[in-house]
């Protein structure tokens, strides 16, 4: 069995009617997918359901026992089960992380099937991550209504559905299209070269896995979104209206229940950066953070530092070791930056190596802007804090997120050169100064604050996200009476 057989069962229900079980299935080694899944599980428990989070069998990319144990300890209302370690199928190349995720999930299907068959009570619903899409076949085989939970934006799902249409219209790979614009219902035009790298080559295994997953979406009982309609109305309406699927293909119900963001851990010692922020004027600090995998070359770090120094603005910068230098000891910070940088900026800047409590930082009143890699969890945290963004996408779906954020939601402005070898110091300085000092930056801040208010209203009693969640929970609590509760009436 896996390292965590059945880590903890939910507390017994003392009423005469047993609680209905929902199983949420998340892939290994992807905290950005696991955290929202755990938050979804907690909300469902509050609605009277029993929830078990199943974690995909770990491989060399696995998150590790201490990480999983920490998640478990912080989520006492949930049960956890870790599938046995899966063996990578021989037809999956070792060089593609995304293909490995799809392949390992497929290889774990027999173990998932065994767990679902033995679960007591029998699950009323199976909720799966996009990378675990092959598990839909297991749910269908066992007669368990199966839903997808998407940890990306609604616009990404609209594109994913519409990819089947594009696939029918052309035999070219996205890579062949270069910067040609793709026109998808409900979305701004997307440059083909901004799509995730793993789907650019039509005949690659990762691209075939992705297309297969998009087809499975249409065969599910519903699509659960970590977003809300007020943030993405055109994409939401395009999906619900059936504009993103092939003619004759079913569009499953859409449940927009977000934004769900990971709460700050209770009881943790307050990070020193928050005390530093306490001493800064309101909305004066630019926060730069690029996710757990966001690394830059040594020269790019120097360009960023030079730009921040030239800008004259206050900043809090989370810096990771340069690309290729990740495993070296921390050493002297000065070696990473232009000569004198730390001394020259010590009165208005703070550099932190590795980690800060991002949500708490964004929620601090001193923070006036966020330079972000456009990971969706980070975007939602910024929206919920009302902090405007400068978009600097790095990998995966972040380039398309940038398009949606800048062109559609209008909650960010792009750092020019993000798609080139180097972003110059002058661009960093100009954009940071623009964000904090200009009328345009102030207008961007007002739009972000308006989006924050709309998102919070969606989560309140009677709000669209709250209503969608209640409808979803009601479906599962009323066993065998599956209705099509969509958020659009």
Specify the residue positions occupied by each region the protein language model found.
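Glycosyltransferase specificity loop/lid
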Residues: 2-489
